[in-house]
């Protein structure tokens, strides 16, 4: 255990920076962030006990410092004025001239693009391109519509069709699938007393006739003969017109007259009581 602790102390002491080294970052961004006051590269200095151990950086950084010193220097106030500008703000006295030009409606573009030569030496801010929009343009694009009527949403004038009477009106009211027997019963205007005519007579089993009304003694459409779909032994109960319908032959539509009376007695005796 003592040997492990001793080896750890030796490794920690050997890794200490006891020899002067040249510490340089991959780019000069860190040095620029630390030295924005005078705008030039300065050697990186530690704050603490390592200042007495590491001497000032010689050699390469001093050459870079000598090269940078020949360039024009910018103070911190100039950099702050650059950073504080917004796109819709115009510096110095150019804002007053632009406001007057916007009110007149015809701003002088030549004066905006080419500032006077006296201001170039006074301040470098005169090269900022102004983006202030004149008032006549702001009034044009000041409001935007919230809802726009599309071409297919515009109100259209509906022309009312002339009133039809008789057979033509009845044909317009009946849909195209009425001839197949799927439409609900509708009242014919030609039937007196407001009687309703079913599209398909399920009890009788006859196809509906083509409706036709006499016009001056002639038929508009020729009448078709009713087609009977009823079979002889269809097994359908047909109600009679008598007040007390008979329920003897409920499951059979009729009695075969060829059956002998003896066979009829046998079949009646086989029925359940």
Curated annotation (Swiss-Prot):
Biased composition, class Polar residues, residue ranges: 240-252
Species whose genome carries this gene: Mus musculus
Assembly mode: Interacts (via C-terminus) with ARHGEF5.
InterPro entries: Odam
Tissue: Highly expressed in tooth-associated epithelia. Predominantly expressed in mandible.
Entry's family note: Belongs to the ODAM family.
Pfam families attached to this UniProt entry: ODAM (PF15424)
GO biological process: biomineral tissue development; inflammatory response; odontogenesis of dentin-containing tooth; positive regulation of epithelial cell proliferation involved in wound healing; positive regulation of gene expression; regulation of actin cytoskeleton organization; response to wounding
Full protein name: Odontogenic ameloblast-associated protein
Keywords, in A-Z order: Biomineralization, Cytoplasm, Glycoprotein, Nucleus, Secreted, Signal
Residues with glycosylation annotation: 114, 118, 159, 240-241, 247, 252, 258, 267
